[in-house]
């Protein structure tokens, strides 16, 4: 199955998906030193996003969230890619400055934690491969 959205980035990426059904604030919601979700209200609290394809509806919170995404990247704890239903500037800028491929405008209800996907930010495609 292929899903279509709009992409930012160049590299085709494959990986395991981790899905949150709640909006995510990177500032105070993700530990930039460990890549662990620390937001007490998150449905994926305690999970690591390191090396996974992070899926969530949209970002929320402070503009500092872009720099938290960048810190995750610098610390080697960033997601491999990000898929969101609704693109907003905080997450988009964070992905761009960190070199993390991003696909927006995708119906995330089709994705489940543990699935394997391939994303192509140039075409905006998300392909479920396992």
Swiss-Prot record:
Protein name as annotated: Phosphomevalonate dehydratase small subunit
GO MF annotation: an example: hydro-lyase activity
Primary role: Component of a hydro-lyase that catalyzes the dehydration of mevalonate 5-phosphate (MVA5P) to form trans-anhydromevalonate 5-phosphate (tAHMP). Involved in the archaeal mevalonate (MVA) pathway, which provides fundamental precursors for isoprenoid biosynthesis, such as isopentenyl diphosphate (IPP) and dimethylallyl diphosphate (DMAPP).
The UniProt record lists the keyword Acyltransferase: no
Record text on subunit structure and interactions: Heterodimer composed of a large subunit (PMDh-L) and a small subunit (PMDh-S).
Keyword Glycosyltransferase: no
Keywords from the UniProt entry: Isoprene biosynthesis, Lyase
């Amino acid at each position: 199955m292929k899903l279509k959205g709009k992409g930012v980035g160049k590299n085709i990426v494959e990986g395991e998906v981790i899905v949150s059904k709640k909006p995510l604030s990177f500032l105070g919601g993700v530990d930039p030193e460990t890549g662990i979700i620390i937001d007490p209200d998150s449905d994926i609290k305690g999970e690591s996003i390191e090396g996974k394809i992070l899926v969530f509806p949209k970002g929320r919170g402070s503009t500092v969230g872009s720099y938290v995404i960048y810190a995750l990247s610098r610390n080697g704890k960033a997601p491999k890619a990000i898929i969101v239903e609704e693109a907003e500037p905080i997450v988009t800028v964070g992905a761009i400055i960190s070199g993390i491929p991003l696909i927006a405008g995708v119906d995330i209800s089709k994705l489940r934690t543990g699935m394997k996907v391939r994303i192509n930010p140039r075409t905006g495609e998300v392909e479920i491969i396992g």
